[in-house]
A protein has these predicted regions:
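C-terminal catalytic core of tyrosine-transesterase DNA break-rejoin enzymes
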Residues: 37-51, 122, 136-162, 169
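C-terminal secondary-structure termini that scaffold catalytic or DNA-interacting sites
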Residues: 21, 25-28, 91-100, 105-110, ...
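Short beta-strand segments
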Residues: 77-79
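Active-site/catalytic core of tyrosine-dependent DNA strand-transfer enzymes
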Residues: 10-16, 64, 82-130, 207-209
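Short, polar N-cap/turn motifs at the start of nucleic acid-interacting alpha helices
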Residues: 59-66, 130-131, 150-169, 176, ...
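Conserved short hydrophobic patches within well-ordered secondary structure
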Residues: 20-23, 44, 144, 154, ...
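Catalytic-site neighborhood detector that most strongly recognizes the C-terminal catalytic loop/helix
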Residues: 2-3, 10, 68-74, 84-86, ...
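Basic, Lys/Arg- and aromatic-enriched nucleic-acid-binding interface segment
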Residues: 1-49, 53-54, 63, 73-75, ...
Length: 209
């Protein structure tokens, strides 16, 4: 899914398991707990870092199971969500106030969380995947999809699908092959990351629990 000549790095099932074990460790701080939740969502959705770090609650559609990221003149990018990703977002919702704009608010000020880089350096060392970049989580999503028999057009659709910016134009995606494919891929990754989909818990490691 990337142009020829670009660096490719995917996490193996064993590496995903190690990553999951590190993410499940008790959080040393609220920052590390937030970073762990963001990393889970990145690998379970194939979304770009900025799409999750800067996610607003108004962009999360629990009814149709998708993220609807506003862009510019192109309308909106729709990211279908599997059950594991939806559960993480639902858990996260329990930890944020009803008037909070951001899914992952900053500890100070009115912006969103932006401390992922520092935390990722620590997490990947502990998981023994020191050469893995945050963007490689997106590559991993695509690789798992291909290995699960999901067609490349569907994977490409999940990673970069765009729709016009009205509810009527995107709501029908809830029952399309894109949503089904996202769930297949997410379930495969969750099985490796958590041991089973039942183990998914977005905030069980938070220091302020």
């Amino acid at each position: 899914l990337a142009p020829s000549g670009q660096r490719h790095r995917y996490l193996s099932p064993q590496e995903l398991k190690r990553l999951g074990e590190v993410l499940d460790q008790p959080a040393a701080s609220e920052t590390s707990g937030t970073a762990a939740t963001i990393i889970r969502l990145l690998v379970l959705t194939g979304a770009r870092r900025g799409e999750i770090e800067g996610l607003k609650w108004s962009e999360v559609d629990f009814n149709f199971g998708m993220l609807r990221k506003e862009t510019s003149k192109t309308g909106a990018k729709v990211i279908p969500l599997g059950r594991a990703a939806l559960q993480i977002l639902d858990d996260q919702r329990q930890w944020t106030s009803s008037n909070q704009v951001w899914v992952f608010p900053a500890q100070k000020g009115d912006g969103h969380f932006d401390g992922l880089s520092k935390e990722w350096g620590r997490i990947r060392r502990l998981a023994k995947i020191a050469d893995v970049r945050i963007h490689d989580l997106r590559h991993t999503f695509a690789s798992v999809g291909a290995g699960s028999g999901v067609g490349l057009p569907l994977i490409g659709g999940i990673l970069g699908h765009r729709q016009a910016s009205t509810t009527q134009r995107y709501a029908h995606l809830a029952d399309t092959p894109l949503r089904s494919a996202a769930n297949v891929i997410g379930s495969e990754i969750a099985a490796a990351l958590f041991g089973s989909t039942a183990a998914v818990g977005a905030n069980k490691e938070r220091a302020d629990a």
